[in-house]
Regions:
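Polybasic low-complexity intrinsically disordered regions
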Residues: 1-70, 75-80
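A short, flexible helix-boundary coil/loop motif
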Residues: 130, 158-171
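Short loop/turn segments at secondary-structure transitions that flank enzyme active sites
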Residues: 34, 92-94, 155
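Helix-centered, glycine/charged polyanion-binding patches within enzymatic domains
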Residues: 65, 70-142
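Hydrophobic/aromatic-lined pockets within catalytic cores
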Residues: 124, 154, 158
């Protein structure tokens, strides 16, 4: 009778680096300069990151660069359709490794993209934010919203203490 309260019917399984994970994903769009999370979208764990581009892109993003990893290679057209410039690291394939020039280009692209990866590192390491211990999509969305809010507060304090010139008031 009360089985539904003990079983999460919204969560799904996924495999990441050979490890199985059950639950939800927190997809984010963040500012490269400040590392503040601007927008987020919660999905079950089985949804691939590349399928959640459109919900994160806004009208104000048109004309800007969007840094993506190699998993988004097939979604380049969607990013262009949204009016953004996709910056995607190239990927080597079997019997067709990357050239030295491609490796150099990837290094340049990765310098900007890694700033966003720092967010996930902080959320997972310092905040234990990769775990959502609730049942249901609605509660997972709320948990991710709070995690992202707390991260932004931490980040705002860091910016205010060490780089106050990045904080601008828009009146």
């Amino acid at each position: 009778m009360h089985k539904k309260s003990h079983k999460d019917v919204d969560a799904r399984w996924t495999k990441k680096r050979g490890e199985n994970h059950y639950g939800y994903k927190n997809h984010i769009k963040a500012d490269k300069k400040t590392k503040l999370i601007e927008k987020y979208h919660t999905t079950d764990a089985s949804v691939h990151d590349s399928n959640v581009i459109k919900p994160l892109i806004e009208e104000k993003d048109k004309g800007q660069d969007l840094f993506l990893d190699t998993g988004y290679e097939s979604k380049e057209d969607i990013v262009k359709e949204c009016g953004m410039n996709p910056i995607i690291c190239e990927k080597g394939h079997r019997n067709n490794p990357l050239t030295d020039e491609q490796k150099q280009n990837n290094r340049i692209k990765s310098k900007d993209r890694c700033r966003i990866e720092h967010i996930f590192g902080f959320v997972e390491g310092a905040m234990n934010g990769s775990l959502v211990r609730s049942i249901g999509m609605l509660r997972a969305k709320a948990a991710n919203a709070l995690t992202n809010l707390v991260y932004n507060i931490f980040r705002y304090v860091q910016i205010n203490n060490y780089q106050p010139q990045l904080i601008t008031c828009k009146g």
